[in-house]
Amino acid sequence: MPRLVTISRFLISAALMLCGAAGASAQDRRQNAPGEFDFYVLSLSWSPSFCEAASERGNNGRGTQAQCGGRPYSFVVHGLWPQYERGFPEYCQRPSPRLARNIMTSMLDLMPAPGLIYNEWDKHGTCSGLGERAYFEAIRKARAAVKIPEEFLQLSEPKTIAPDELETAFIKANPGLSNSAISVTCNSGRLSEVRICMSKDLQFRACEEVDRRACR
């Protein structure tokens, strides 16, 4: 099995504050109406941290094995989340339209766990106002619009870096991305996610509420 954590783990300075989730939980006046939101957050999860934390918890479930038991990943797509300027919608259709298996399997190169894909559709995709296929096409388009800095594609040893330095690396690699459109989240001194704000047509845009909750 690839030495995923040992050689690929990405560390955040232990002095950093822990971060909360993007956006407040309070809903705005639109009350989870599908398609009624202000912008997207593309959330990119740092896979080595996820796998290391899962190992420490003794979590060897099917979803963990799908991401952590095969080829080593760096950043994987956690999701594309509709957001309000303050807060976010979720689970906008109950019951949610059934996600076709062929759509799920088509996304495994970006989101390497079936359970994650189904959950993202139920929780976030149903709020996009898009059909199943169009929503996951939007995820693929959003991911293609973001270039991962070269130095984080193939780490050979643990690395410690400040969140601002990581943000700067993404900004340099992605013309048009500003520090008001990106945030870095961490957990227990490890990199957790990079979150990038995008307009509904998937262009980089500022998001003060999301950035305010980043690691600093």
Positions of predicted regions on the chain:
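N-terminal module-boundary/linker segments of secreted carbohydrate-active enzymes
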Residues: 27-53
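Domain-level detector of nuclease and nuclease-like folds
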Residues: 55-216
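Bacterial N-terminal signal peptides
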Residues: 10-19
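Sec/Tat signal peptide C-region and signal peptidase I cleavage site
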Residues: 22-26
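N-terminal secretory signal peptides that target proteins for export/translocation
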Residues: 1-6
